[in-house]
Amino acid sequence: MYETIHWPEAMKPSRSPIHFTNELEVAASVETIWDLLTDPAAWPGFYPGVQHVQLLDGHTCFGADTRFETNLAGQDVYASVQEYEAMTRIAWGGYPKIAEHSKAYHAWIITPTANGCHLWTEETMQGPHWIELAKQAPDIFWLTHEKLLKDLAAVAVAREASRA
């Protein structure tokens, strides 16, 4: 049985016009996946469209309450880590700099399996900016996360193979 997302009240799926989930079994360890997800320098290697991640609190890796700026979904985004449980779950919430009233909350759960781990990612989005983007390409967010999971898995498997 997999865990559930700990949604902030305001960002629960029942309150969000955009909500999607993606999952994937990965033949890589929880530790490798966690290292990639929490290392901002690694994101451009697997996160579609991400060219940079800047941590704003002097940290070198994501941790509880870390604030950061990046470019997600073609948008310059300000975000902060709102849930952090090492090796198990991480979530961040934020908004595009050009539309502060359009919010997003993106959560991850990593569960060990016999052959590696199970990745579950779920996101909710609210506000006119995200809604307009979804109208233009209804499946874009879900498809981007499908690519994200596949690319993250490929990088993780390659990293483990290089250590063998």
Q: Whereabouts are the PLM-identified features?
A:
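Hydrophobic ligand-binding cavity/cleft-lining segments
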Residues: 1-58
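Short coil/turn motifs at beta-sheet boundaries
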Residues: 15-17, 61-63, 72, 101-103, ...
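Short, surface-exposed coil-to-beta transition loops
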Residues: 19-21, 75-79, 101-107
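Glycine-rich portal/gate segments that line the openings of hydrophobic small-molecule binding cavities
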Residues: 25, 54-99, 154-159, 163-164
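A short, structured loop/turn motif at beta-sheet edges
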Residues: 27-31, 82-87, 109-118
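Generic detection of well-ordered alpha-helical segments
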Residues: 31, 75-78, 142, 146, ...
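Hydrophobic pocket/interface hotspot
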Residues: 32-37, 43, 68, 81, ...
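Beta-strand/loop substructures that line and gate deep hydrophobic ligand-binding cavities in soluble
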Residues: 96-147, 154, 163-164
